[in-house]
């Protein structure tokens, strides 16, 4: 019988290790006991997945292959050591080798009671659903006063103690035999037919149709129309394919889409129950063969792109347009990164188009205030542009009936919008050369994307929260998936290679020069890519709370439990890669919060997300508290100062301007209590717990400001609609981490710059992995302009210099 024995401490001197070594010798005729140490297992950190580390994979493999497991634990503060707890966290996070595995607990400690309380706690952990070990009931071996229990040879001195240990161990051997019989695969049969079930997806109900024969799951059809395009698409192919291939429900959830993944698995399980089958039998079956591929692979290409979001895919498409080979490596199962989670609004001044639209009330006043800015407060490198802008606006104000814009207005707003001072008194603003490239070439990015296949809606000029001006170009297809779908299609049609589930870990260096990258595949296999150039486009670190806290110099506090709008993939990998070869960092202390995020999930597209000109924000007293047209950090700080939670108030007309929803979704959210609706403002106030008279007064005042085109309370930058037509809505909102402005230092050609100021040969970067453009605060809509503009530039420079 093959047993794994785990020393439950990383201490160099341990009586639990001595106990297991004694058991290995004493029971050598009964079992082959392999003792494993946990010293090299990292502390568990959910935001930095290290499941693929050899130390963790070694435990996963050996435990999976063993007949049973013994854990020897000491007792620290009435519980198990943190190092042992970390191991169990890793072994129940992405891999689950202890599921159903027969397990025996032993323990040694200095105290007379042995490790009784630690063993009790350990048993509770092992019984948890994510671990689900088959712990032997009853018999526990507790070795008290362990420092007196062994002789110099490491043998137990007391015959009675040895007898008790033998009794426990022999019971465990019998327990292993019985428990493993229960783990043997069972046959399952179904009542053949087609079964309709409804399960829960990320965005709501997920209808499914499952077809079963008497012995097999034959077909799985999913109505995914209610889910966000791009984010969960991989779920609707991978999960059903692996279920059908292996005839198993032992399928891993897709990273970044675990709610929808588990919804699909639950839906199939419900269908199996309806057909008279037992889904638990299928949960114990092996994974599908395709899910177990561990073969190392090696590739060669001209340019390798690290990251499959908007910046990475734009760079890849541009490499292909230059006639070169490209590979995109994306660590998550699906492409898209933060781009697919964005609102799809791309800032670019397009005056000829914009002037065909009328100005909104307050916009001319906004420009008048801007050009009155004291020139002494403008940085020297921006001053000439500011003076030219003053002349442009002065001429415009002679007839301010239409929507004005220019590259220079965009540049100055990006500069002023990003100009911030941190808690240490350090003032930052965007690098002029980088901001100039952004605002001069962003319209080229719009035209380039249209040529790639993105269909833009030219019927209106859009504006996201914190943008400061209406200049956003919006695809007809909702949100950011339009960009990802078009670029993905272009890359695949033009023979580009995309590998998902491929996390880059290191550069390949030859004589100090970058010659490609090393990566880990889905099952820990090594992926080697030789290339002439590397483009880092892996995003920022908005989903890595510890890293945010480490670098933060702007916010007074970043809470451990803060929500994020980001993909879980956005954890700073590319920044750390750059640091590993001496890349300089810039602006790392500044992160941005999205003020209008879901209080429970951090999502930005629940409730009613409308243009800022239609924002009416009220606090928990029913009062407005900020200029809703302001920058994101201004809105977030104001919200935090007002308790965090606030409400966006809308009426039927404002609801029609929402860019993120449908009537069906609205009904579901109202029913779920995550969106409030009422026929009167008084009734709405009661639902959200504010004084009705206060809310009515607030809205009446706001409506009068819309009529006047001026807000005497908060000087709102622009207005559109009044709040006057029932039904009325309240969307709960709370700030969540959204964007990190800092990252790798680059120049205007997207070279990554070393700490000594020199370029790193063959290394380029684009998008949120870089810093220097947005400084202390990013304008809404500038992220997409950034990634598509500098993604193209990075590719062009890489091809010109290296290929």
Curated annotation (Swiss-Prot):
Pfam families: FAD_binding_2, FMN_bind, FMN_red
Disulfide bonds, paired cysteine numbers: none
CC cofactor: FAD; FMN
Active-site positions on this chain: 632 (proton donor)
InterPro entries (alphabetical): FAD-dep_OxRdtase_2_FAD-bd, FAD-oxidoreductase_2, FAD/NAD-bd_sf, Flavocytochrome_c, Flavoprotein-like_sf, FMN-bd, FMN_Rdtase-like_dom, Succ_DH/fumarate_Rdtase_cat_sf
EC number: 1.3.99.33
Reaction catalysed by this enzyme: dihydrourocanate + A = urocanate + AH2
Gene Ontology CC terms, in alphabetical order: membrane
SMART domains for this protein: FMN_bind
Keywords: FAD, Flavoprotein, FMN, Oxidoreductase, Phosphoprotein
Enzyme class of the recorded protein, top EC level: oxidoreductase
Listed SUPFAM superfamilies: FAD/NAD(P)-binding domain, Flavoproteins, Succinate dehydrogenase/fumarate reductase flavoprotein, catalytic domain
Cofactor binding remark: Binds 1 FAD per subunit.
Residues where FMN phosphoryl serine is found: 258
GO molecular function: FMN binding; steroid dehydrogenase activity, acting on the CH-CH group of donors
Function summary: Catalyzes the two-electron reduction of urocanate to dihydrourocanate (also named imidazole propionate or deamino-histidine). Dihydrourocanate is present at higher concentrations in subjects with type 2 diabetes, and directly impairs glucose tolerance and insulin signaling at the level of insulin receptor substrate (IRS) through activation of p38 gamma (MAPK12)-p62-mTORC1. Therefore, the UrdA enzyme from the gut bacteria S.mutans strain UA159 may contribute to the pathogenesis of type 2 diabetes by producing the microbial metabolite dihydrourocanate.
Family matches, as PANTHER family: FAD-DEPENDENT OXIDOREDUCTASE 2 FAD BINDING DOMAIN-CONTAINING PROTEIN, FUMARATE REDUCTASE
Family the entry assigns: Belongs to the FAD-dependent oxidoreductase 2 family. FRD/SDH subfamily.
Note: S.mutans strain UA159 is significantly more abundant in subjects with type 2 diabetes (T2D) compared with subjects with normal glucose tolerance (NGT).
Protein name as catalogued: Urocanate reductase
Name of the gene this protein is made from: urdA
């Amino acid at each position: 019988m093959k047993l794994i024995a785990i020393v439950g401490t990383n201490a160099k001197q341990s009586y639990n290790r001595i106990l297991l070594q004694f058991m290995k010798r004493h029971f050598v005729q009964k079992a082959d006991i392999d003792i494993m140490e946990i010293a090299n297992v990292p502390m568990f950190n959910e935001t930095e997945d290290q499941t693929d580390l050899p130390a963790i994979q070694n435990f996963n493999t050996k435990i999976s292959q063993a007949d049973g497991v013994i854990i020897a634990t000491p007792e620290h503060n009435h519980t198990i050591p943190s190092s042992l707890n970390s191991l169990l966290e890793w072994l129940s996070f992405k891999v689950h080798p202890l599921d159903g595995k027969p397990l025996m607990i032993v323990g040694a400690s200095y105290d007379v009671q042995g490790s009784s309380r630690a063993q009790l706690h350990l048993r509770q952990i092992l019984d948890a659903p994510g671990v689900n070990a088959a712990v032997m009931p009853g018999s526990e071996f507790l070795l008290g006063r362990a420092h007196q229990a062994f002789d110099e040879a490491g043998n137990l001195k007391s015959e009675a103690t040895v007898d008790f240990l033998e009794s426990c161990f022999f019971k465990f051997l019998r327990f292993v035999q019985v428990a493993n019989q229960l783990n043997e695969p069972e046959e399952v049969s179904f009542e053949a037919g087609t079964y309709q079930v409804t399960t829960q997806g990320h965005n709501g109900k997920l209808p499914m149709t499952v077809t079963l024969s008497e012995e097999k799951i034959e077909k799985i059809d999913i109505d995914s129309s209610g889910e966000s395009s791009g984010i969960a698409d991989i779920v609707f192919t991978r999960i059903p394919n692996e279920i059908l291939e292996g005839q198993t429900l032992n399928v891993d959830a897709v990273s970044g889409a675990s709610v929808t993944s588990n919804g699909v698995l639950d839906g199939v399980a419900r269908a199996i129950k309806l057909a008279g089958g037992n889904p638990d039998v299928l949960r114990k079956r092996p994974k599908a063969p395709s899910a177990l591929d561990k073969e190392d692979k090696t590739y060669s290409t001209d340019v390798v792109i690290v990251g499959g979001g908007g910046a990475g895919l734009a760079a890849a498409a541009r490499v292909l347009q230059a006639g070169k080979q490209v590979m995109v490596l994306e660590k998550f199962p699906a492409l898209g990164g933060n781009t697919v989670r964005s609102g799809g609004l791309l800032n670019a001044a397009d005056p000829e188009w914009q002037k065909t639209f009328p100005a909104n009330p307050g916009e001319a006043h906004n420009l008048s205030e801007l050009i009155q800015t004291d020139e002494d407060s403008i940085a020297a490198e921006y001053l000439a542009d500011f003076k030219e802008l003053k002349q442009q606006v002065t001429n415009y104000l002679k007839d301010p009936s239409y929507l004005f814009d220019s590259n220079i207005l965009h540049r100055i707003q990006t500069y002023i919008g990003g100009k911030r001072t941190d808690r240490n008194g350090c003032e930052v603003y965007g690098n002029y050369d980088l901001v100039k490239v952004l605002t001069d070439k962003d319209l080229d990015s719009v035209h380039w994307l249209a040529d790639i296949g993105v269909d833009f809606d030219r019927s209106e000029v859009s504006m996201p929260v914190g943008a400061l001006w209406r200049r956003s170009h919006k695809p007809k297809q909702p949100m950011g998936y339009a960009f990802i779908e078009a670029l993905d299609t272009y890359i695949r049609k033009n023979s580009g290679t995309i590998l998902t589930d491929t996390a880059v870990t290191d550069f390949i260096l030859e004589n100090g020069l970058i010659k490609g990258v090393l990566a880990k595949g889905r099952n820990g296999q090594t992926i080697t890519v030789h290339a002439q150039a590397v483009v880092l486009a892996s995003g920022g670190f908005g989903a890595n709370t510890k890293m945010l806290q480490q670098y933060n110099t702007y916010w007074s506090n970043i809470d451990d439990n803060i929500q994020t709008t980001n993909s879980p993939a956005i954890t700073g990998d590319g920044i750390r890669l750059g640091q590993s070869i001496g890349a300089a960092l810039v602006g790392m202390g500044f992160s941005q919060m999205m003020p209008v995020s879901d209080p429970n999930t951090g999502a930005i597209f629940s409730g009613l997300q409308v243009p800022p000109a239609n924002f009416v924000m009220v606090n928990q007293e029913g009062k407005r508290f900020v200029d809703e047209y302001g920058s994101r950090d201004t809105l977030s700080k104001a919200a935090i100062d007002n308790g965090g939670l606030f409400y966006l108030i809308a009426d039927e007309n404002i609801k029609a301007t929402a860019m993120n929803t449908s009537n069906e979704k609205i009904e579901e959210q109202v029913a779920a209590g995550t969106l409030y609706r009422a026929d009167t403002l008084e009734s709405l106030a009661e639902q959200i717990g504010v004084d009705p008279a206060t809310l009515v007064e607030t809205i009446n005042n706001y409506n009068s400001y819309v009529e006047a085109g001026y807000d005497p309370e908060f000087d709102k930058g622009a207005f559109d609609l009044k709040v006057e037509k029932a039904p009325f809505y309240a969307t709960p909102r709370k700030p969540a981490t959204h964007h990190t402005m800092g990252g790798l230092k680059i120049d205007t050609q997207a070279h990554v710059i070393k700490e000594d100021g020199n370029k790193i040969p063959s290394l380029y970067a684009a998008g949120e992995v870089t810093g220097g453009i947005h400084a202390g605060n990013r304008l809404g809509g500038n992220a997409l302009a950034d990634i598509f503009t500098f993604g193209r530039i990075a590719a062009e420079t890489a091809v010109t210099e290296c290929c």
